[in-house]
Swiss-Prot record:
Protein name in UniProt: Exodeoxyribonuclease 7 large subunit
Catalytic activity: Exonucleolytic cleavage in either 5'- to 3'- or 3'- to 5'-direction to yield nucleoside 5'-phosphates
EC number: 3.1.11.6
InterPro entries: Exonuc_VII_L, Exonuc_VII_lsu_C, OB-fold_nuc-bd_dom
Family, as annotated: Belongs to the XseA family.
Cell compartment(s), UniProt: Cytoplasm
Highest taxon listed in the record's lineage: Bacteria
Assembly and interaction partners: Heterooligomer composed of large and small subunits.
Encoding gene, per UniProt annotation: xseA
Function: Bidirectionally degrades single-stranded DNA into large acid-insoluble oligonucleotides, which are then degraded further into small acid-soluble oligonucleotides.
Keywords for the protein's UniProt record, in alphabetical order: Cytoplasm, Exonuclease, Hydrolase, Nuclease
Enzyme class, UniProt record, top EC level: hydrolase
An example Gene Ontology biological process: DNA catabolic process
GO function term, MF aspect, one: nucleic acid binding
Amino acid sequence: MDKIYTVSEVTYYIEALIDQDQYLSDIQVVGEIADLKERNGHLFFYLKDEFTTIGCVFFGGAYRSFGLSDGRIAQVAGQIKVYAPRGQYRLICRQAKILPERGTLFLRMKESYERLVAEGIFDKPKRPLPEYPSKIGLITSRNSAAYQDVLRTISDRYPLVEIFLYHTGVQGEDAKGSLLRALKDVNESDVDVVIITRGGGSRDDLWLFNDEDIVRAVYKLRHPVITGVGHQIDTVFIDLVADYSAHTPTAAAQAAVPNLSEIRMHFLELMQRMNLSIRKKIESFSQQIESSNKSLFQSMMSQILRTHSSIDSMKEKAFALMQRQMFSYEKKLSSAGTKLFSLNPVELLKKGYVIVEKDGKWVKSSSILREKDEISMRFFDGVVKVVVK
């Protein structure tokens, strides 16, 4: 063929063929519901069987009456239409009916869960996360948006930590082996905490994290584990064995490290409280010292006053004693003076006594005198010289 067609021409041609097909304009399809999501008032999901998958959409809110949920088998009536912007065909649904049987994915998940419960995998006590980790082991794909989200979040919050990437595929045939190797390697490392993460995806995309071997490997990790797989509505089995399960990769990174800015603010608040406490202590001590000084001063003054009073009393007693002694001495002196006065030779001479002297010496007896001796006779009012006959 020589004619060359544009993408739009091919798409519109296929769309016309499907629109003209009477079988596809009113068709009923049976399959297992997967990856059911509400968006802008519409319901998007997939119907799948063992071999293939078809996209489905309920426009408007009519779907709410049908009780659709992931893992259930549904019989859906509608029309096959082409979604030209993506070049995809899908089932535009009008009605749906839930069938009593369960889907294979649901049954597989139920069986795995029951086996893991029997092993006690989900009963493991949660370990505390390190408050200030220095090394983080990150298990994810190096090409994923989740990897960039974790790096950016940790860099913004706590750039002091080292991040060691353990690259793994997160979907596809080789993903399980790749993830098991990453878990083995991180278990032999000296990291402080492990983050296992990937971005959102369909239930099939996230099935890897429900795999029993993966769950057991996570259970055996020596280090505390944080999971951040999918989005807020997604829960997988490794979330149940993790020490902390976050809704998103960003939330997992936030759980792994503290916020350095908040630490600084907390430190400043502590410093302010400590300074205030120190000031209050100093003021209290100053008041105590001032009170002690006043008390000491008052005590010293009281002691000084008591001492002064005691000294005054002692002085009075000493003065009285001195007065008594002086009076006694005066009496004794007066008595002695009287005696001395009475013994004064002059006083005796006045009474008529005479002192006889010879050669300047007192004559105490007449026997020592000889005739013609010159003697002196001392009266109270003068001396007379005489010759002995």
